[in-house]
């Protein structure tokens, strides 16, 4: 399975515009190792957000990736996957690039936004709550996790100022 994963990375990187990282990132300092069965594929260089590629793979090619975010998709290889499945993924990614790629300058630039922590998560979660429409929450303190799924990464957490 390791050989199949490395083959997938090589073929995906040959398409151009995608980057499926491999062992070149291991530096012994901040990155020690990674799960080779997970294909993390950067998509922004073809002008598409990861979630867009995720949706296209699912809707147009019947390929279910694990998740997509602003700049990447994550796909797993399992013991049930063979060369044929990898070839389907690589072909789909190549066709997505050909059919749907656009100027990457149109993508939203995302910078990390430091949250304003107004109180501890415990205080916010267990404190008194009020349910409001999202448009009326500016300046309030979040009391629950707010996230999109997939991938399930919090946008707001308890205690953060909205």
Short names for language-model regions:
Residues 13, 20-161:
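Conserved C-terminal alpha-helix-loop-beta "cap" of PLP-dependent enzymes
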Residues 1-7, 85:
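Structural signature of PLP-dependent enzymes
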């Amino acid at each position: 399975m390791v050989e199949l994963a490395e083959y997938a990375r090589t073929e995906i990187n040959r398409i151009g515009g995608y980057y499926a990282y491999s062992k070149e990132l291991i530096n012994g300092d901040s990155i020690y190792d990674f799960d080779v069965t997970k294909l993390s594929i950067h998509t922004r260089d073809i002008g598409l957000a990861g979630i867009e590629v995720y949706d296209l793979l699912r809707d147009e090619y019947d390929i279910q990736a694990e998740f997509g975010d602003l700049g990447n998709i994550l796909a797993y290889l399992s013991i049930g996957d063979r060369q044929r499945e990898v070839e389907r993924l690589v072909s789909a990614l190549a066709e997505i690039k050909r059919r749907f790629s656009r100027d990457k300058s149109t993508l939203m630039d995302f910078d990390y936004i430091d949250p304003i922590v107004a109180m501890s998560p415990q205080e916010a979660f267990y404190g008194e709550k009020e349910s409001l429409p999202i448009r009326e929450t500016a300046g309030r303190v979040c009391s629950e996790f707010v996230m999109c799924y997939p991938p399930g990464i919090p946008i707001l957490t308890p205690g953060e100022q909205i």
